[in-house]
């Protein structure tokens, strides 16, 4: 194997700390072709779909990629904005806010950037760019508060694949989850409190999370437990009793059993149980995207109202809200503990290297 080297390195270059923010990714446009490329990459990840490769290759290429892109393109077109994909611009806003904060505290010693697990900007391209800027200590923060092998684990795989091909590997720290991190819990609770201040409360507060196949749970994935813990901690912060909130799981795909209760089934059944108003929040999504805006904000709203519900409200994701940025900043600071960029004499380093025959 030919290992990738830093062609721009010089001995005058200052060592830096890198903070890499990651999220899932998004198609380049709400069009069939773009969706097909995105879905092929996403659904080819064995962390996401744990099915024998040959069987899944046939299902994916002969069935799914011939049907789903067109339907998904239509769904994306309903949430696309002048700034593009909501997930993309919210992640950019989060990164910009964190970069500004880090710049104020550390100057040019800390580099903050973001990458997507699927699509662009890729983890590979952004990581290599950070290394070329002199990053020798790299902190990676996937914006998935609750750990799952399909998200956080997959991100680690992608990072590992990049570093496996890199000659000079930096020190690396990886934040695998933050589902019970107090500032994050406070930020979620704060967004709910702010919504209540304007709209009042509903009969039921529903925490809805992206689902995963149930067999992932039985195989040892902690995601289910971490979703429930996040919800419990937020509910305790808000002073809610057990009957005032519930946890559901959305976005199931395929025919096998996923984590239950299902969000759509729950919303269809609540009105007949006397629940006439609900407020929905998605603590597992750090930024609004198709699954929150369209699936929860529109599709599931229709299910509830058609079943006899009278009031349905979606509480937006934390996005780049100040309390969320403060929580992420606190999380980053905690995990940077002990890392420092030494104030070395770069000119002296260059002179000594030149004396020993280096041309860089």
From Swiss-Prot:
Sequence positions that bind Fe cation: 210, 291
Primary location recorded for the protein, binned into one broad class: cytoplasm
Catalysis: reaction(s): heme b + 2 H(+) = protoporphyrin IX + Fe(2+)
Subcellular location: Cytoplasm
InterPro entries per record: Ferrochelatase (IPR001015), Ferrochelatase_AS (IPR019772), Ferrochelatase_C (IPR033644), Ferrochelatase_N (IPR033659)
Pathway, per record: Porphyrin-containing compound metabolism; protoheme biosynthesis; protoheme from protoporphyrin-IX: step 1/1
PANTHER family registered for this protein in UniProt: FERROCHELATASE, FERROCHELATASE, MITOCHONDRIAL
HAMAP family in UniProt: Ferrochelatase (MF_00323)
Similarity section: Belongs to the ferrochelatase family.
The name this protein goes by in its record: Ferrochelatase
Organism (species): Pseudoalteromonas atlantica (strain T6c / ATCC BAA-1087)
